[in-house]
Amino acid sequence: MTTKDVDFFGKTRGHIQAIHNEISALSKSKPDVPINKFKLGFINEKLRETNTLLKGAFKPFEKFETFDEDALPTNSDVVLVLAQYLDCLESWRCANIHSDDFNWYWKVDGESIETERPTRYRKS
C-alpha cells in the first residue's frame, strides 16, 4: 500500500458518502422515483473508481459493476447499493490499518499515516 492508495481511498469514500447522503435525502420523500441520467452518470463514475479498490471479498456484489443507464434505478435502489459500498470500503480500510498504543495507522511502507479508529477490526 502507498500514500497514493490512502489518498485515493479518502477521496473515493468521501465522494460515495456525499452521494449517499444526497440520494438518501431524496429517497426519504420519493423512494420509487427513478434517478435522472445526469446524476446516474456521476454515480457510475464513482462506482467504477471504487471498484478498483474493492476486489475479491471486499466487493459488495459479485456481478454488479455500475447501474444500467437504460434502466434507470430508483432513489432507494441507489441508496441500498451505496450503503453496501460504504460498508465494504470500511471493511477494506479495517484490513489495511493497524494499532500502536491506542492510535491507528495505515499499513504503508516507510510512513505512519494516522487514521480514525475502525468500526470493526479484522486482523490480517
Annotate each PLM feature:
Residues T2-F102:
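Charged interaction/catalytic cores of defense and host-pathogen modules
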Residues W104-S124:
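Short acidic DE-rich linear segments
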